[in-house]
Amino acid sequence: QRQMCIRDSPFAIGWTPYTLKCMLVGLLLYGCGIALYYSSRENRRPGEEYGSAKWGSPKELNRKYMDHQHKDANIILTQRVRLGMDGYITQRNMNVLVVGGSGSGKTRFFCKPNIYSANCSYLITDPKGELLRAAGALLAAQGYEVRVFNLIDPSQSDGYNPFSYIHSEKDVLTLIDNLIKNTTPRNASSNDPFWERGEIALDSALMLYLVSEAPSEEQNFETLIYMMNFADVKEEDEQYRSPLDMLFRALEEEQPNHVAVKQYAIFKQAAGKTAKSIVVTAAVRLATFNIPQYAEITRKDEMDFGSLGEKKKAIFCLIPVDDSSMNYLVGMLYTQCFQALYRRADAKYNGRLPVPVRVIQDEWANVAQPESYPKILATCRSYNIGLNIIVQNVQQIKALYEKEHESIIGNCDTLLFLGGGNEPTSLEFIVKLLGRETLATRTRGLTKGRNGSSTTNYQQTGRDLMTIDEVRKLDTHKAILFIRGEDPVIDRKYNLKRHPNIKLTLDGKAKPYIHKPQGAPDYALPDLPYAFKSLDDYEFIDMEEPEHELSEKEKDFKPDKTE
């Protein structure tokens, strides 16, 4: 009968007096088994005991990160690897760090291919003007607006006036701070901050005066240093009033709370000898703008940095390779360009520019970068901006940003190593970045003699994916590519001759591009307003006259505002 019940209802569950006891015993045995398993289990990663580094596949990397729908909208990295420019799709920023020794092809294998693609707006540092000559005609044919800031031959330069990007008192202080930092030698010993603050007070007073009181054509560094030439200081006579003092006194009578008046008052608190030292220091720092050719290219502005993110536009900054004394002007340009792009994006486009902007900084270490460069690297992705840092070795980054060099490297999701250098720091850096792999080794032992024997041992050991010696001897035609979160790959450098737009460039036998500036400035420095309108006509008091007579003349002085 029991067998018939089981046959008719094989899944029927019956309850007996032993059911509960059996369940408890079963649970107890199950718990003991789990405890025994975890107590005896070891932390094992077979084949990865000494490291899990391995080489990736260029084909797989390209399949994952290339923008296949818009094949022209990619960053060219190696012969077989592209990176899409839409960060929301790739989840990687457009910041690329390119490291390669002299002759490794940083310009040929990275800069030129990406400029020839003509798929975004560009801000380019161009030593020797090589990139402009090679790519200018192509960009012009593609409908680009090409602008050039030429420190090699200023007569062929478009205008860049830093005053055109001053929109508030804060911008004035930022510009002065950038000017001072970019014209101070990198390894200069720190001076008393008093002198620097005094110089800032004087410079800011003059800039704020020009921005608020002078016509737009007079708002430039040439006018500023012209004004500074009249900041006479008599060490032996604290009561002496220079023409510049008279100018600010006239402004104070009209607008006592003017910020320029307040800044000038800070400067005037310095004693005669101290004030003279401040004036001399400030004048020497601005001496560049006494040179006619540099004064001319900074009189008016033709760059319009904000439009880089709105239309196809390329700005080339040409710097001489044998003289870096004027490169601080490019540093100022970069600072104001980033400010203008961020401001335009926030004001008009909800924080993201419609046209991608790539900043290709060849010879990055030769141009003073903005003080906030690490922050710009960290935030530019959301604004649709990508920074491409091109250096000969990692030590150049450490020299400029000793405390923040790791942050700069870390904010570049892509690193391209082109080889061609013997600098130990860079070689060690690449070796550590590649990591270590686990290898299976076999050792054999042989004992000869009457009772000879042989043994074979199998074991695992760790090894760098590439040693320093192997990195140093990397094939000239190959590069090592790192993309954040991916295995490194070795691939051939890009073949420039296979670029689809090569025929329109100098490398494709086209004629070199010769830039024609927008036109020579038609502005000649007029006299300044207020006291400067008739400065040469003033009859200044001889310092040997009695002190009470000097004070009387000062008291009666009124600037002629009707001229």
Predicted regions and their residues:
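Conserved ATP-driven motor cores of ASCE-family P-loop NTPases powering translocation/secretion/packaging/pilus
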Residues: 377-480
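P-loop NTPase motor domains
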Residues: 92-385, 400-403, 410, 461, ...
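Membrane-interface segments at the starts/ends of alpha-helical transmembrane spans
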Residues: 7-23
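N-terminal pre-Walker A segment at the start of P-loop NTPase domains
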Residues: 58-87
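Canonical hydrophobic alpha-helical transmembrane segment
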Residues: 19-34
